[in-house]
Amino acid sequence: MAPTDASTDASTHASTGASMHTGPASTPTCNEDTLELRLTDDFLALLSEDGDARVGETEAGQESSPAKGELLDHLADWGPVVTPAGTLHLVPVRLERELPLISHWMNDSTVASYWKLAGPEDVTADHLRTQLAGDGRSVPCLGVLDGTPMSYWEIYRADLDPLARHYPARPHDTGVHLLIGPVAERGRGLGAILLRSVADLILDRRPSCARVVAEPDLRNFPSVSAFLSAGFRFSAEAALPDKRAALMIRDRLLRDLM
């Protein structure tokens, strides 16, 4: 789910395995969109401690499953990335803390048309819980830019996702979905800036990953444009269960050229 500008916020939800829901969309006010939540450095450090819990402990003699976080090289420890728009932290979501804000964004009419998570908070909560209760192959994150929460991200193992049935996946392909929350932040190129920076952060923090992939809805022209501006290339059209998608790829070998 990746968008750009006005639709980088509303486009790339699809393949994390969570069920899709629809519901009435409400139109947030401008004041609601720009919730002034600023986080101190100490609080940001506290938030980044979320994702290190280990899972998969088994009795002696049994093979253990991957520890929570290993499938994405411990995303919670990646640290901030400096972008032309400011310093961005990807902070793994805590449901009880971020649900009201993320649900508020999902009820924006433009966002709802692509993410299909409008409605009461329970709709968004179910989507988040599916990822949070999993094995760490998909990590929902809050994007905090210069201390202000302003975007929602899903970083996921595309090669382990249902998306892999619809394109020639390679081991460790990593997918990205982006929603820019505040309406005032859309339509001015911010999506492309953040997508490029996060894609390169993924490639820097995941040495085994050769490609970052995305599958925005083909109808979401601003989102597709943002990916192209962010150094992704259009690879193919993909007929997914919930949409016809543009398969976008950012290659490690080509990132200095695009």
Model-derived regions, located:
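Conserved beta-strand-loop-alpha-helix junction that forms the acyl-donor binding cleft
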Residues: V212-V224, P241-D242
